[in-house]
Amino acid sequence: MNAPLGGIWLWLPLLLTWLTPEVNSSWWYMRATGGSSRVMCDNVPGLVSSQRQLCHRHPDVMRAISQGVAEWTAECQHQFRQHRWNCNTLDRDHSLFGRVLLRSSRESAFVYAISSAGVVFAITRACSQGEVKSCSCDPKKMGSAKDSKGIFDWGGCSDNIDYGIKFARAFVDAKERKGKDARALMNLHNNRAGRKAVKRFLKQECKCHGVSGSCTLRTCWLAMADFRKTGDYLWRKYNGAIQVVMNQDGTGFTVANERFKKPTKNDLVYFENSPDYCIRDREAGSLGTAGRVCNLTSRGMDSCEVMCCGRGYDTSHVTRMTKCGCKFHWCCAVRCQDCLEALDVHTCKAPKNADWTTPT
């Protein structure tokens, strides 16, 4: 009896290592490094060799990616603004989000998708703006073409989204491709879903040419939609994310519940249920909801009942300066007065034990 138990204890550390992802630094931290490309490439912890090579070889692309981090994190925070976990970032943490993304949850799925989408968007935009030496406008969009409105000429600058997707796949997926575990496959799937989401909203824009504004000739180009459209789309995918398990040969997924539909390449997938994010929990990486503003009249996720997890709330009476009495003056200005507005602000109470908790 002792021998089998001894064998179990011997293998337990290896089993836990396989099941639990390591707290790794990430290219997400590029936002915080700043400085020259060489400084950035050499000082972002956790980049694998192929990522560092791309970083040194394409400093202009890296600048676009690092500037784009702020954009997709802001979009993540916008989408989660009314939820207990609000996509808060930790400036001093190399993983940007701390331990909360160690869990293979819906939130992890969304962050990987929106970050991958953000890289595509940032690179493609930089190409169109002439900020990247290795790419420019889409070279395939030349000559004449036809759509439902008739013949048109490709002109202007079509966003070269294929280059953005190709570079994003090579850079973002590099670390995950070195892994063989379930979490690596989950991240790769959600990375791809994010890239596809940006391309989904590529739209054709046209300009008419002719006498008195007639559309005798049309010049058209392809342009990415505002990143908010991608964020809204991925938010819907987050709410419909599909829980999966690894298949028997370890090469893909199968649904965790046979009542679920099989995930497509556009869906987000996750393995583990999310924590409730109610209290500060060091192991889960949760900051809790103590002090968060809640909506007393809402019945949604931002309601005081849901946001505060039943702990109650404090009410503060505050005043703020607002614009009032606005009038339109010909021509062409709107003039307003500054008014003081009194309002009540409701914030979630802290739990009785407000310190970090460690689950037993």
Curated annotation (Swiss-Prot):
Subcellular location: Secreted, Extracellular space, Extracellular matrix; Secreted
Classification via Gene3D superfamilies: 3.30.2460.20
Signal sequence interval, chain numbering: 1-25
Entry-linked InterPro entries: Wnt, Wnt2, Wnt_C, Wnt_CS
Pfam families in the cross-refs: wnt
Post-translation changes: Palmitoleoylation is required for efficient binding to frizzled receptors. Depalmitoleoylation leads to Wnt signaling pathway inhibition.
Disulfide-bonded cysteines: C76-C87, C127-C135, C137-C157, C206-C220, C208-C215, C278-C309, C294-C304, C308-C348, C324-C339, C326-C336, C331-C332
GO CC terms of this entry: cytoplasm; extracellular space
Sites where a glycan is attached: N295
Residue ranges crossing the lipid bilayer per the database entry: none
GO biological process: atrial cardiac muscle tissue morphogenesis; canonical Wnt signaling pathway; cardiac epithelial to mesenchymal transition; cardiac muscle cell proliferation; cell fate commitment; cell proliferation in midbrain; cell-cell signaling; cellular response to transforming growth factor beta stimulus
Lipidation (O-palmitoleoyl serine): S212
GO molecular function: cytokine activity; frizzled binding
Homology family: Belongs to the Wnt family.
Free-text function comment from the UniProt entry: Ligand for members of the frizzled family of seven transmembrane receptors. Functions in the canonical Wnt signaling pathway that results in activation of transcription factors of the TCF/LEF family. Functions as a upstream regulator of FGF10 expression. Plays an important role in embryonic lung development. May contribute to embryonic brain development by regulating the proliferation of dopaminergic precursors and neurons.
Name of the featured protein: Protein Wnt-2
